């Protein structure tokens, strides 16, 4: 928490804070008025007034932890900290009133808005500082704003877990995601993006000229479930059911067992097996109107998808560092964890966001406070 000092420094300022251009460097003391402060320990300080001998501008210099506002920086930090921990605005005001520092809900909300805006600006400045990130993880989530669903993108450094950006997107379509991926790739200079298996991210990665690792946790369990469903469908086929030319029930069982082994091993060299299976079932006819898809057609679709996405699924095995170690995560858990900590954990206790400004600022504030540990964390936000 910020420290509140009761003693004002007698050291003259080094520049004149006048809005008009002034290059004065000499000042004289112009009184030492008392200022009432709302704080848990300090209730009043003396501010030092200075007069610029060049332009005559008179200004005040406050002790550490005190500004022009009635609240001390420590009290502002406490109100923000209580809210981030999960307390409502009303609960924050009740807690501070019990400490002898009553604040209104509007004042607490204003403290949140100020610190959230500064935290968001610091995250954006860090992202635009030409930082180098090799693997960028990104994922979308949905929250409610005044009853309307909003798309929020969480972008994270896959290696360190550091939040790069939390932003609100207008939509989750291909055009929006592609432009976003291109912008992030340009700002970070990344080589790889880590995401789920949505086609929008695949298009965005190709447009940005970067590699993509598809989260295996999004693909492997669903594919294994699909393999078992197709196996049950093949097992329950009636004897009189015709089979496509060149295919048989025994062959389907062998191919399903091979697919299960390929999915569990996830070896890059299995690409040619998938291409062979894809060619084997490429002539399987689709279902007629009103009919269910046959197991042969479902195998055709599954092998086609796997053969196309296999390089993206196994990039973590093929793409290694100079020392031979893997540095690309196989799953996008880093994004899921960041979404839970920065967005969802505090959002669960709310009835939705009331404005887009709050939606942009509060997750950024949570991410900044979670990552920037230490006593100077709040001081850097409140002093900005």
PLM feature segments, named:
Residues 2-15, 40-46:
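Short, flexible, mixed-charge glycine/proline-rich loop motifs
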Residues 16-20, 52-55:
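Short cysteine-rich clusters marking metal-coordination/redox-active sites
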Residues 19-25, 58, 95:
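Cys/His-rich metal-chelating microdomains
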Residues 195-198, 202, 242-384:
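Acidic/histidine-rich catalytic cores and adjacent linkers
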Residues 195-240:
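Conserved beta-strand -> loop -> alpha-helix junction used to position metal-binding or nucleic-acid-contacting
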């Amino acid at each position: 928490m910020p420290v509140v000092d009761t003693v004002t420094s007698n050291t003259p300022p080094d520049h004149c804070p006048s809005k008009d251009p002034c290059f004065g460097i000499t000042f004289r003391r112009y009184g030492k008025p008392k200022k009432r402060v709302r704080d848990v320990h300090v209730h009043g300080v003396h501010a030092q007034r200075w007069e610029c001998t060049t332009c005559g501008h008179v200004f005040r210099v406050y002790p550490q932890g005190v500004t022009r506002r009635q609240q001390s920086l420590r009290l502002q930090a406490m109100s923000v900290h209580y809210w981030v921990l999960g307390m409502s605005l009303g609960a924050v005001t009740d807690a501070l009133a019990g400490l002898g520092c009553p604040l209104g809900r509007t004042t607490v909300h204003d403290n949140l808005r100020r610190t959230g805006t500064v935290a968001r600006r610091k995250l954006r400045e860090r992202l635009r500082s030409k930082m180098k990130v090799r693997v960028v993880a990104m994922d979308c989530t949905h929250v409610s704003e005044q009853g309307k669903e909003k798309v929020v993108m969480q972008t994270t450094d896959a290696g360190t877990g550091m939040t790069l950006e939390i932003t609100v997107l207008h939509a989750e379509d291909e055009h929006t995601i592609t432009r976003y991926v291109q912008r992030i790739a340009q700002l970070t200079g990344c080589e790889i993006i880590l995401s789920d298996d949505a086609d929008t991210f695949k298009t965005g990665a190709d447009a940005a000229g970067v590699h993509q690792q598809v989260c295996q946790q999004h693909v492997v369990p669903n594919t294994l479930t699909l393999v078992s469903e197709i196996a049950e469908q093949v097992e329950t086929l009636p004897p009189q059911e015709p089979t496509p030319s060149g295919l048989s029930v025994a062959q389907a069982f062998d191919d399903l067992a091979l697919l299960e082994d390929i999915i569990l091993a996830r070896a890059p060299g299995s690409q040619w097996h998938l291409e062979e299976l894809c060619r084997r079932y490429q002539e399987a006819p689709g279902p007629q109107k009103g009919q269910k898809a046959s197991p042969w057609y479902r195998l055709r679709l599954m092998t086609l998808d796997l053969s196309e996405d296999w390089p993206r699924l196994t990039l973590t095995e093929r793409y290694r560092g100079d020392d031979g170690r893997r540095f690309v995560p196989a799953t996008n858990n880093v994004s899921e964890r960041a979404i839970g900590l920065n967005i969802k954990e505090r959002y669960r206790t709310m009835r939705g966001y009331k404005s887009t400004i709050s939606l942009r600022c509060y997750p950024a504030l949570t991410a900044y406070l979670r990552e920037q540990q230490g006593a100077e964390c709040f001081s850097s936000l409140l002093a900005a």
